[in-house]
Amino acid sequence: VTYRAEYIWTDGTEPTAEVRSKTRVLADGDEPGIWGFDGSSTNQAEGSDSDVVLKPVYTCPDPLRGGNDIMVMCETFLPETMEPHPTNMRAKTRAILDKYGDQDFWFGLEQ
């Protein structure tokens, strides 16, 4: 038995990033792991060196497909170093929250 994992990330479109996704079919019991995509088609890389890594950070049931299918929220990383991709806004936000987590925040996050 298989299920579908819909990997979701934000691309490099400016001035406002767009949501991208691609589907991976996994065997029952397999966890969604690190995957990749061609960043030249998402404004995240040049065509000659276009690999970008998708790293899952959160999964939830897929409300659109139902069943055992899931949505996989991802961050993007550079394949050579596994450092956050320049378009990875979640990594930048996490760094700020890690640094100032003991403070009271007076702002909201939107997606």
At which residue positions do the language-model features occur?
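ATP/Mg2+-dependent ligation/transfer catalytic cores
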Residues: 1-111
